[in-house]
Amino acid sequence: DLLREFLGAPDDQIDCPTEAQRELFGPTRRRVPEMLDLKNPVLLGPVQNQEHHMNGVVARRDNFNEPILGFLEQCYDEFAQLTGRRYGLIQEYRTEDADTVFVSLGCAAENVEAACDYLREQRGAKVGSIHINVIRPFPEAAVINALRGKKNVIVLERTDEGMSGDNPLGRDIRTTLSKGQEASRYGGTLPSITLDQTPRIFRGSYGLGSRDFRPEHTLGAYEFAVGGTVRKDGKSAADGETYFTLG
């Protein structure tokens, strides 16, 4: 009943929320548009010339992609009203006074949060965690606001793209902070962050080949970032190294 109330029925008629949708569907549309009508079996887009394909890609970005984050935030608010459980584009854990913040996806965040509790209680370390709930579109404004003024950010990912400059999430974090620096110089819609407010980015890979990811791995990541340990090749954060593998 809760899911039915929150999601509605596929054939409900709802108001179109954007001008682009109103132009496409009219003032209202089916909650889940029918992609195939057996009574009118037509197909759109299997073959397009270069001009029309490019126009479609640009129109999709401007008219349909950009409003998505706002829709998601509205959905999180409605879900919180129904259940009392509030999610968001990102979830912050003990980040208010943290100088080192972990960033992760999925169930890894639970291990990271447990390690943050241990580091605070046993070592007095000011650490926190950010759990990214939405990866596309990437929540750039929320990430900039959450990381502004931190000393270190440790991005943990269950992958290793060895021939790329960064793994995917680390690349998104680095790009986001760079765009925030541009906003501080040139303005724009994103929140601004100065170079002095930008944390140093550390990047770690864990759990490759389904190897276990344990809280002690998070402790090791923290020790590397603050200069308390070195990699097996002897290199450390003091040498300018920011990548490591856990486990």
Task: Identify the residue ranges that each predicted region occupies.
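Conformationally flexible catalytic loops at phosphate/diphosphate-handling active centers
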Residues: D1-Q91
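Short acidic, glycine/serine/threonine-rich loops at helix termini
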Residues: L2-D12, E113-A115, E140-A142, S164-P168, ...
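Solvent-exposed alpha-helices and their adjacent loops that cap or buttress functional pockets
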Residues: F6, Q13-P17, E92-D97, N145-L147, ...
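Short helix-loop-beta junction
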Residues: Q74, E78, L82, A114-S129
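Redox- and metal-dependent alpha/beta enzyme cores, enriched for Fe-S-associated oxidoreductases
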Residues: L89, E96-A125, F138-N145
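Short beta->alpha junction loops
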Residues: I130-R136, R203-G207
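Peripheral docking tails and interdomain loops at the edges
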Residues: I154-G247
